[in-house]
Amino acid sequence: MLKIMLAVFLGGGTGSVLRWWLGLRLNPVHHAIPVGTLTANLAGAFIIGAGLAWFNRMTHLDPMWKLLVTTGLCGGLTTFSTFSAEVVFLLQEGRIGWAGLNVALNLFGSFMMTALAFWLFSSLSVR
């Protein structure tokens, strides 16, 4: 159990630091869309799609690795709470269109990235 907790902890810490760095570097890029948060959510969605497809095929791997990547890394990297707060801030500023675009980009973009990665990694041949 301690090994599993450590894997989730390490993955989560890595994902959280990466999310913080993306926000720091990319959120100032656009005046209304928090690009760092969007990038973190889309990257995390792609990684979890790829990870789920990969780990479904690589059944011989220790389940700890799946937890490190999916629960840990992706859980730390992606952020529904920050995304939600940023949408609320846009709404409070009267930027309804930007808030709607941010919702669409994060939600539909994440679904598409997960599906794309799952499809791509499911179609790879295992050697």
Curated annotation (Swiss-Prot):
Membrane topology term: Multi-pass membrane protein
Subcellular location: Cell inner membrane
Regulation affecting activity: Na(+) is not transported, but it plays an essential structural role and its presence is essential for fluoride channel function.
Transmembrane segments: 4-24, 35-55, 71-91, 101-121
Catalytic activity: fluoride(in) = fluoride(out)
InterPro entries per UniProt: FluC (IPR003691)
Role summary: Fluoride-specific ion channel. Important for reducing fluoride concentration in the cell, thus reducing its toxicity.
Keyword tags: Cell inner membrane, Cell membrane, Ion channel, Ion transport, Membrane, Metal-binding, Sodium, Transmembrane, Transmembrane helix, Transport
Annotated source species: Cronobacter sakazakii (strain ATCC BAA-894)
Amino acids binding Na(+): G75, T78
Record-level Gene Ontology MF annotations: fluoride channel activity; metal ion binding
Family membership noted in the UniProt record: Belongs to the fluoride channel Fluc/FEX (TC 1.A.43) family.
Protein's name according to its UniProt entry: Fluoride-specific ion channel FluC
GO process terms (BP): cellular detoxification of fluoride
The encoding gene: fluC
